[in-house]
Amino acid sequence: MYDVAIIGAGVVGSAIARELSKYQVNACVIEREEDVCNGTSKANSAIIHGGFDATPGTLKAKLNVRGNFLMDELARDLDIPFKRNGSLVVCTKDQIGRAHV
């Protein structure tokens, strides 16, 4: 018997499973593919979102910044390479007034 069933072993499902492994929780991950991250997560750009499009002060903006900050620690914990490449965002003249740097 499991306490938690996690549907999908993509980025989100795997992150949830990792977090729950820190507690006394009996969890199982149910995945339709033969391996983890073989669906949508496999087709990502492998770039950590810079949060450039979120409206300042919103929950999305705060979570973008926090998640980005946590990547260094996560990379160390998992012993995986991680390099900050930066971002280049192009906007039109109409968008310059709304651009946040």
Residue spans for each PLM region:
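Short coil/turn connectors at secondary-structure junctions
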Residues: 1-2, 25, 43, 85
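N-terminal Rossmann-like FAD-binding beta1-loop-alpha1 element of flavoenzymes
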Residues: 2-29
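Short glycine/serine/threonine-biased micro-segments
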Residues: 6-8, 37, 44, 48-49, ...
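Short N-terminal amphipathic alpha-helix/helix-capping patch enriched in small hydrophobics
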Residues: 12, 16, 32, 44, ...
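Loop/helix-junction capping segments adjacent to catalytic residues or to phosphate/diphosphate-binding pockets
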Residues: 14, 38, 97
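Glycine-rich FAD pyrophosphate-binding loop
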Residues: 21-43
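Dinucleotide-binding Rossmann-like beta1-alpha1 core, especially the glycine-rich loop
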Residues: 46-100
